[in-house]
Amino acid sequence: MDFLPLFCQLQHKPVLIVGGGEVAVRKARLLLDAKARVTINAPHLEPQLMSWAEQGLLTVCAADFHPELLDGKWLVIAATNQPEVNQQVFNEANRRQIFCNVVDSPAHCSAIMPAIIDRSPLMVAISSAGSAPLLSRQLREKIEALLPQHLGQLATLAGKLRERVKAIPDKLARRRFWERLFSHERLACQLARGQQQAAEESVAELLNEPQQSKGSVTLVGAGPGDAGLLTLNGLQQLQQADVVVYDRLVSQEVLAHVRRDAERIFVGKEAGCHCVPQQAINQLLLEQARLGKQVVRLKGGDPFIFGRGGEELETLAEAGIPFSVVPGITAASGCAAYSGIPLTHRDHAQRVQFITGHDKEGNIAQEWPALATPRQTLVFYMGLAHAGRIQDELQTHGLPGHTPVALVEQGTRLQQRVVRGKLQQLAQLATQVESPSLIIIGSVVTLADKLDWYGEANTLAGV
């Protein structure tokens, strides 16, 4: 982070703009909106600046820049077309420890003016640290279209309610009130239509509702790793959670979307190494929900595909704890797509099977004759430890040794690696990758030669 985002209170505080052209006009308009005491220093001024000066909105010093003008200033903006003057302003401001913005010169800025979306008192500021101002403006236009005008009124209303809401003794109940207020569709419509009386009645209803927090658990699929594959609903749940209980397979990029003041509890486990037993996880979810918290149980991939999500929900259902499920993109879909391997294809596979590499006893017990039939795709989850057994059983039951296979390590992530070869090499190929890895078996693997769009540089051919 090159610049810390910071909103400054400049009301009635002296600031200086060096320059009198169109850029100075734009900067002065922003500072006047912030109610700053603006001084313009330039020998010649744009008509708009002269007009503001005549109205008494700003002060003019019609002379060349001299360092004494910086005395007592909180901020200075250099907006001249003379690089040597801008450099002098920057040097003198730095010497006095005054924030300085030199227009179109990021290297000479101790402060950056962002692209702004104004829904006062709600403000959204976007900055590229001066490296791509046009990109910041384009993002502002996109976000501007998403934010309704009444958000400013809603923020003002929230400010008026702060003291009343502080009187609610329970911290979680206070946060629940704010969540209901900001997502209240009827209130939003009333504010947008200017129906102030009706809006106040809606707020009164919310304040009079029982404030007792009722806990619940939401089972959320985090997807296979790439945070861009997290669903919109999943993202919303992470932003609303009081507690997030997560597994080893959840990427740091996904965890970065968790609400900052939410408690994070790691319960990671892998085959043969359960740092937190499943029963303890079930009990943890119960305890947190009974405390009135909104709990997110975050699992890699999809929680209902080899994720033991069903077992956890059974425990919650038996205890009468409210729960819901947000599906995720399962590892088979994500890893195959990011490896250029379509799981089904009319010329190759009319069926796909997802198979766990080990059951709850740690064994791999399968209907091998059914798995060894042609024109299908097999996807083994958690199968690395049994790669040799998978190879032997499939070949023994009739699947040719030349059947293409792929092992996808860290699928969909920047670290993704794909090792491809033949079924008769599977045990050997498994030594070239680490967990978490997925095994894909079937002729669809050959299509990766043409369809690999994501990780060509990280794809290895089998021996």
UniProtKB/Swiss-Prot annotation:
Signal peptide: none annotated. Then it catalyzes the NAD-dependent ring dehydrogenation of precorrin-2 to yield sirohydrochlorin. Finally, it catalyzes the ferrochelation of sirohydrochlorin to yield siroheme. It catalyses: uroporphyrinogen III + 2 S-adenosyl-L-methionine = precorrin-2 + 2 S-adenosyl-L-homocysteine + H(+); precorrin-2 + NAD(+) = sirohydrochlorin + NADH + 2 H(+); siroheme + 2 H(+) = sirohydrochlorin + Fe(2+). Residues 215-463 are annotated as: Uroporphyrinogen-III C-methyltransferase. NAD(+) binds at residues 22-23, 43-44. Pathway: Cofactor biosynthesis; adenosylcobalamin biosynthesis; precorrin-2 from uroporphyrinogen III: step 1/1; Cofactor biosynthesis; adenosylcobalamin biosynthesis; sirohydrochlorin from precorrin-2: step 1/1; Porphyrin-containing compound metabolism; siroheme biosynthesis; precorrin-2 from uroporphyrinogen III: step 1/1; Porphyrin-containing compound metabolism; siroheme biosynthesis; siroheme from sirohydrochlorin: step 1/1. GO terms for molecular function: NAD binding; precorrin-2 dehydrogenase activity; sirohydrochlorin ferrochelatase activity; uroporphyrin-III C-methyltransferase activity. S-adenosyl-L-methionine binds at residues 224, 300-302, 305, 330-331, 382, 411. One of its GO terms (biological process) is cobalamin biosynthetic process. The modification Phosphoserine is found at residue 128. Its EC number is 2.1.1.107, 1.3.1.76, 4.99.1.4. This is Siroheme synthase 1. It comes from Aeromonas hydrophila subsp. hydrophila (strain ATCC 7966 / DSM 30187 / BCRC 13018 / CCUG 14551 / JCM 1027 / KCTC 2358 / NCIMB 9240 / NCTC 8049). Pfam families: CysG_dimeriser (PF10414), NAD_binding_7 (PF13241), Sirohm_synth_M (PF14824), TP_methylase (PF00590). The active site is at 247 (proton acceptor), 269 (proton donor). In the N-terminal section; belongs to the precorrin-2 dehydrogenase / sirohydrochlorin ferrochelatase family. Residues 1-203 are annotated as: Precorrin-2 dehydrogenase /sirohydrochlorin ferrochelatase. Coiled coil: none annotated. Keywords: Cobalamin biosynthesis, Lyase, Methyltransferase, Multifunctional enzyme, NAD, Oxidoreductase, Phosphoprotein, Porphyrin biosynthesis, S-adenosyl-L-methionine, Transferase. The keyword tRNA processing does not apply.
